[in-house]
Amino acid sequence: MAASRRSQHHHHHHQQQLQPAPGASAPPPPPPPPLSPGLAPGTTPASPTASGLAPFASPRHGLALPEGDGSRDPPDRPRSPDPVDGTSCCSTTSTICTVAAAPVVPAVSTSSAAGVAPNPAGSGSNNSPSSSSSPTSSSSSSPSSPGSSLAESPEAAGVSSTAPLGPGAAGPGTGVPAVSGALRELLEACRNGDVSRVKRLVDAANVNAKDMAGRKSSPLHFAAGFGRKDVVEHLLQMGANVHARDDGGLIPLHNACSFGHAEVVSLLLCQGADPNARDNWNYTPLHEAAIKGKIDVCIVLLQHGADPNIRNTDGKSALDLADPSAKAVLTGEYKKDELLEAARSGNEEKLMALLTPLNVNCHASDGRKSTPLHLAAGYNRVRIVQLLLQHGADVHAKDKGGLVPLHNACSYGHYEVTELLLKHGACVNAMDLWQFTPLHEAASKNRVEVCSLLLSHGADPTLVNCHGKSAVDMAPTPELRERLTYEFKGHSLLQAAREADLAKVKKTLALEIINFKQPQSHETALHCAVASLHPKRKQVTELLLRKGANVNEKNKDFMTPLHVAAERAHNDVMEVLHKHGAKMNALDTLGQTALHRAALAGHLQTCRLLLSYGSDPSIISLQGFTAAQMGNEAVQQILSESTPIRTSDVDYRLLEASKAGDLETVKQLCSSQNVNCRDLEGRHSTPLHFAAGYNRVSVVEYLLHHGADVHAKDKGGLVPLHNACSYGHYEVAELLVRHGASVNVADLWKFTPLHEAAAKGKYEICKLLLKHGADPTKKNRDGNTPLDLVKEGDTDIQDLLRGDAALLDAAKKGCLARVQKLCTPENINCRDTQGRNSTPLHLAAGYNNLEVAEYLLEHGADVNAQDKGGLIPLHNAASYGHVDIAALLIKYNTCVNATDKWAFTPLHEAAQKGRTQLCALLLAHGADPTMKNQEGQTPLDLATADDIRALLIDAMPPEALPTCFKPQATVVSASLISPASTPSCLSAASSIDNLTGPLAELAVGGASNAGDGAAGTERKEGEVAGLDMNISQFLKSLGLEHLRDIFETEQITLDVLADMGHEELKEIGINAYGHRHKLIKGVERLLGGQQGTNPYLTFHCVNQGTILLDLAPEDKEYQSVEEEMQSTIREHRDGGNAGGIFNRYNVIRIQKVVNKKLRERFCHRQKEVSEENHNHHNERMLFHGSPFINAIIHKGFDERHAYIGGMFGAGIYFAENSSKSNQYVYGIGGGTGCPTHKDRSCYICHRQMLFCRVTLGKSFLQFSTMKMAHAPPGHHSVIGRPSVNGLAYAEYVIYRGEQAYPEYLITYQIMKPEAPSQTATAAEQKT
């Protein structure tokens, strides 16, 4: 569903306009003739402006020619010479018939009316550019523009209103009538692609009408030339002639090819257009496409049988005239590497887009010089191999080492590919340069099944390679060596039997191979001998039978040698088979006897012989036919004469006892001879038919155990299973199926047992049959499937018969009851094979059916199943904005960063479709906003809404953001901050009344106390007075740290830089003006803005940026924050699943966050809360973990990042325990873990957490889940208190971002817990 927009990323159609200049692909023109073509002797060619006509016409007039001005010279003239009067005649432009919009009066006009002389050639066209008409006057837009319109009237174009239309018309004064108004309107509609007008105007009478005033083009010429696919389709439906020719001999296909309309070309070819049609100058459509460089069209033409060797009247082939861009297609080199890669990787779509007869056997330019077939065969791409073979791939092609594709397939054991290649004539004993055969390859790699296949096609295991080794020698196991020898002997015997070569049979015959079966067909030597056309087949048959051949052995179709002999009327060997005990009534897979086969073939004498041997003519096949019914009139006559006409008394009593369920009588009467007797006076039913139809379970069981035939058919072709199913006898049906009854057998009306059960509403029977492979798509003689026969309202059976489709439909429609009834462990992940290959969960997720999705997930649905586009259910939910579904899928551990075939993640989907809440949910659970799709786009690149863009920018790490979005934070080392140097932006500190212990002693505004390591007041020599920073930090603050090496090499400090100008900076190698300007202005602002002792900090505070003050580890403030963090580690109920397993942090860095704007916003909100809460703002220092930390320190807390699915709704969550916040660092529940290792318990990667000032104000105490978007009325926050079945530790939730200030940014690692022994040792050492 969500993938329907993919095509826009992969297909971009570019329409190339015709150029007025002569094309480079035109053949060199011959010397100009004495007269300009198309002008009367003694006539001076008129200039384009003289007649008001453009020098060439545009493609919109329905005709495309590869060269000349759009017309063809008479056959006896050179083609398209330059005009003798020097006017610019374009040798490669095309003339298209022009249709004037105004009515044309069919009157005779003098030649002076348009300034054009009559055409003496009589071809209806002129070669002079001055004779080409244009849709507009010479001052209008270029005729090559496809969008330009027709002239409003002939006079507007400088042509007399009485002149005929178009350049293809005879000159004025010739008396040719003008085109009728209705036809003109039709041609104009075809040209413009107005399909509704075309449908209104076209009919059988005018669909092939010619533009008699122009080039005699048909409407199809116009529509094809302009690429109007819809119009072309309609015209073809109306009977348009794809072979219609205009004056120049062009068919519509020429036009479509000339202008590169590949879809129209395909359409015309599919409708029978001749790809090798020649115009009057023997130009084919391929000439046209090649000259114009229409690569796609060239490929389509070649794929449809275009002959690249056809030459025009000048003796030029398409390759000779091809534009350079198209030459590669005609040499087979076009995108050869891509074609080979498509064959290797199995990319059918790509392969078929490039494959032509010219490149189907191309060889790679490097490596092994493989062909596409070599690669497809070696990589087991069965479908690709099929396609290549269908399109003429050479099975004998050799690579650099002399290997044929069969070598590759056999070497890697690809059975199906090997079979395909052999079927298409691959040489089974082909040798490479080292004389290795495919059998050598297969045997040496122990490809047992492939070896058998090769041997069955004549592979010789005795052939030796260049090392003198045979395939048998190279077999790695004794078992394979023995098998190769055995099968080779067996196949040799089969071949000798086929040839009825008595001497060879005697030579190869051995006891162990007498009943050897061909692995694929299961034929024995006896089958081969009786089928042989050679005269000694009888002697060979006798020899084989004497030596122990099984006379009743069956091949894969269950045919005995007697079946084979009878079918071929080999009566001589039938006699031998009968003498050696052949079963006369053995059945093949179709339930046919040898008599059926002989009757079907019309062998009268064979039928007589079989009847004399005891064949039963009353046996009914699985299709419901007796032998007589399958034979001709003569066969029917002799068979009907021998058919018994009444049932014996014993048989009659047995049939009645079976019907009545009289088991004792059945036991007395039943024998192996009459267990399958027939009710000859009735329906020819057997005892089993009666017992099954009357639900006599015990009788059915007894008959089955004593040889009753479950496949026996009555007169109507019904088997016992039909009877049981029709009457709903479940136990009997189950018995019959268990004893091998065919669930898909059909009667004479092609009703299967499933038809019977469905029509009678037998739900359980239908279920049983389907479970055992019944085909619900089979149709009866009336074309009805079992589903069509279900009674209206019987929805349970309807759903059952629809099978997977019903479950998919129920999931799509959100019908939980149907889903519960239909869902089984076998079909819970079934696929919509007619659509996107979606699972029920895909559909439930895409259609927002929460209850269905939950049921499917609870019962084992695959949460990460991919459809044919690679989308998982979360893609669907994200694409359509179904937040609850997405949350449910995440709960069941779906992959939030799963990618489809185009590398789109669910976050890409949500961002592109403007799903804000979905983006927040995905990001909160670890979605990676930096992942790129195949086109290199991140979700941010696809975001359509401003709030989503802001959300994604906040979630992305700074290094992944585009430069324009990167927040600039200044990091200042602790050593640069003196006690008195606190910037003004830190002075607005709030109280920390609620803090106790070491944290309560922290000075809010300062970074350290007076005794904690400051830089001192003394300055080093050479520093600018009052500056507490070095040149490296200054460059970093400007984003110019890459210039540091230059400054260090030249020993330039800040005081030296302060005296430098543009010229001096340029001399030391800083050539970019922008860099020099930034340096000079930066120093000026730095010096001009000094306040206190640290003007650098003041400067940045003025600019409202964020400053990160590095605290020194020995600083009391650092130590207090670390102690608070370490001391609040707790053990959580999830056992470390979310935040990792640890008992201590390794604190790497603690930075104080300074941002004047955020501080002021926090203080303002704190004041509001205090006023609303009796002057108590209730501030706490709390921890916060989030994937948005980088955004928070720059922009503050943003409630848009919140997810409504949290325990207390869409709030911002804080904790007094650092280990609780650690669980959210990579997202809710730990997200997907660290970005590098995808590990929630990673001990390597650095993490970041915030220690924040939070104004709680009046808090609402809550013990259970409550979804809120805002704080409860009269309250400013929610405190989730611990309870028995609720929270283990308290959570603090605010719903306005300005109620918290990120005071400290802590960078840390979790530490792996020490082993107990190590802990004990450490404790002892400490003691």
UniProtKB/Swiss-Prot annotation:
The keyword Phosphoprotein applies. The keyword Nucleotidyltransferase applies. Residues 69-82 have a biased composition (Basic and acidic residues). It is found in: Cytoplasm; Golgi apparatus membrane; Cytoplasm, Cytoskeleton, Microtubule organizing center, Centrosome; Nucleus, Nuclear pore complex. Residues 1-15 have a biased composition (Basic residues). Residues 1-91, 112-173 are annotated as: Disordered. Changing residue 1291 to A: Loss of activity. One of its GO terms (biological process) is mitotic spindle organization. Residues 112-154 have a biased composition (Low complexity). Its EC number is 2.4.2.30, 2.4.2.-. Residues 1030-1089 form the SAM domain. Zn(2+) binds at residues 1234, 1237, 1242, 1245. Phosphorylated on serine residues by MAPK kinases upon insulin stimulation. Phosphorylated during mitosis. Ubiquitinated by RNF146 when auto-poly-ADP-ribosylated, leading to its degradation. Deubiquitinated by USP25; leading to stabilization. Residues 25-36 have a biased composition (Pro residues). Residues 1112-1317 form the PARP catalytic domain. It is an enzyme of class 2 (transferase). Changing residue 1184 to A: Loss of activity. It is a peripheral membrane protein. It catalyses: NAD(+) + (ADP-D-ribosyl)n-acceptor = nicotinamide + (ADP-D-ribosyl)n+1-acceptor + H(+); L-aspartyl-[protein] + NAD(+) = 4-O-(ADP-D-ribosyl)-L-aspartyl-[protein] + nicotinamide; L-glutamyl-[protein] + NAD(+) = 5-O-(ADP-D-ribosyl)-L-glutamyl-[protein] + nicotinamide. Specifically inhibited by XAV939, a small molecule, leading to inhibit the Wnt signaling pathway by stabilizing AXIN1 and AXIN2. Inhibited by talazoparib. Not inhibited by olaparib, niraparib and veliparib. ANK repeats lie at residues 181-209, 215-244, 248-277, 281-310, 335-364, 368-397, 401-430, 434-463, 521-553, 557-586, 590-619, 621-647, 649-679, 683-712, 716-745, 749-778, 782-810, 836-865, 869-898, 902-931, 935-964. Belongs to the ARTD/PARP family. Oligomerizes and associates with TNKS2. Interacts with the cytoplasmic domain of LNPEP/Otase in SLC2A4/GLUT4-vesicles. Binds to the N-terminus of telomeric TERF1 via the ANK repeats. Found in a complex with POT1; TERF1 and TINF2. Interacts with AXIN1. Interacts with AXIN2. Interacts with BLZF1 and CASC3. Interacts with NUMA1. This is Poly [ADP-ribose] polymerase tankyrase-1. The lineage of its organism: Eukaryota, Metazoa, Chordata, Craniata, Vertebrata.
